[in-house]
Curated annotation (Swiss-Prot):
<feature type="transmembrane region" description="Helical">
    <location>
        <begin position="22"/>
        <end position="38"/>
    </location>
</feature>
<dbReference type="InterPro" id="IPR012505">
    <property type="entry name" value="YbbR"/>
</dbReference>
<dbReference type="Pfam" id="PF07949">
    <property type="entry name" value="YbbR"/>
</dbReference>
<keyword id="KW-1133">Transmembrane helix</keyword>
<keyword id="KW-0677">Repeat</keyword>
<keyword id="KW-0812">Transmembrane</keyword>
<protein>
    <recommendedName>
        <fullName>YbbR-like domain-containing protein BB_0009</fullName>
    </recommendedName>
</protein>
<feature type="domain" description="YbbR-like 2">
    <location>
        <begin position="138"/>
        <end position="220"/>
    </location>
</feature>
<feature type="domain" description="YbbR-like 1">
    <location>
        <begin position="43"/>
        <end position="128"/>
    </location>
</feature>
<dbReference type="InterPro" id="IPR053154">
    <property type="entry name" value="c-di-AMP_regulator"/>
</dbReference>
<keyword id="KW-0472">Membrane</keyword>
<dbReference type="GO" id="GO:0016020">
    <property type="term" value="C:membrane"/>
</dbReference>
């Protein structure tokens, strides 16, 4: 009987006035939720995401966006311990080994020691265009500018060399097919010394291409500028014409009215230049060794600098080719 009474009392305690008790419990739950909600702080920031690729695969195209907004909810008490740099956004694509287009989810990794109550991303997926990753050696085109403080323009770049001359580049196969040369950033040099050795920064043709090195070494040798001189009606030399053949109207070819000249950069004085011309040290030469029968031929011109004129540089000349009519020599005709 005692046990029965106790059970009845417990039932009365639980179910008597149950409506009021249910309301009290609901109010308690709401108060608990409201209390905890007020302790949650919401932070919105913009972050870049990383793309993890297989070693054999490269991005074939830059994604339409590289940053997304992320909303982070964390307990107010933990807020001071939150380091946003330790919230990592990434796309896991390391298992993909075949080029193509893939829509992949953006994943989140929390490296903070505190608990993050909730994450919310403005975008959850990214479309990636992937290509085969290849490499090749590409020639470097240096860009530099000579600055003279006094503005006299007395110096010029006599020669230079690049180390290395070619650079190994990596990137998507379709992009690397378009790349034959790589340029550097423009760098200015002054004329305080006649030899300059410095670094040039290599410029990526686009963000998809990576370099083995980011810099190359350039060695520049300066010299005083040459004076520019045009030698009109230079000496003409016809070499190796076979016996039994001759040039028709040779005297008309050498006619001073024809467009013939040699432009040189030189440190030589006008008197020295004239002496070289008179001594036929600067000439246009034509090699006729390949001509075996009479006919009309276009022969390429070559420059001959006799006596090794070290301080002379040829930068233009005419003609580049000359048309010759070769006939049988009159000396062997009956």
């Amino acid at each position: 009987m005692e046990i029965g009474k106790k059970i009845i009392n417990i039932i009365k305690l639980l179910f008597d006035d149950w409506q009021n008790k249910a309301i009290s419990i609901l109010i308690a739950i709401l108060m608990f939720v409201a209390f905890n909600f007020n302790k949650i702080e919401s932070i919105t920031t913009e972050k870049e995401f990383k793309i993890i690729l297989n070693d054999q695969i490269a991005l074939g195209k830059i994604p339409d966006f590289s940053k997304i907004k992320i909303t982070i909810k964390v307990n107010k008490d933990d807020l001071k311990y939150l380091d946003l740099n330790k919230i990592i956004l990434f796309i896991e694509a390391s298992s993909i080994k075949i080029p193509g287009s893939y829509k992949l989810p953006i994943k989140i990794k929390n490296l903070n020691s505190i608990h993050i109550a909730e994450y919310k991303l403005s975008k959850t997926n990214v479309l990636l265009n992937l290509d085969n990753k290849v490499s090749k050696l590409v020639k470097i085109e240096p860009k530099f500018k000579l600055i003279e403080k006094d503005g006299k323009g007395e110096y010029f770049i006599a020669k230079y060399n690049i180390l290395p001359e070619n650079l190994l580049v990596y990137g998507p196969e379709q992009e690397l097919k378009k790349i034959n040369t790589i340029q550097t950033n423009v760098k200015e040099f002054d004329t305080r010394t006649l030899f300059v050795s410095d670094y040039l920064e290599v410029v990526p043709p686009n963000p998809l291409v990576m370099f083995e090195k980011s810099h190359v070494v350039v060695n520049i040798y300066l010299n005083k500028k040459y004076s520019n001189t045009t030698i009109k009606s230079p000496n003409l030399i016809f070499n190796n014409l076979k016996n039994g053949l001759e040039i028709k109207d040779k005297e008309k070819i050498i006619n001073s009215e024809n467009k013939m000249f040699v432009k040189i950069k030189t440190r030589l004085s006008e008197k020295q230049i004239k002496a070289h011309i008179n001594n036929q040290n600067i000439s246009l030469a034509f090699d006729l060794a390949d001509i075996k029968t009479p006919g009309i031929y276009n022969i390429a011109a070559n420059i001959i600098l006799k006596e090794n004129i070290n301080e002379t540089e040829i930068y233009d000349y005419e003609p580049k080719k000359i048309k010759l009519e070769i006939i049988e020599s009159s000396e062997i005709k009956p």
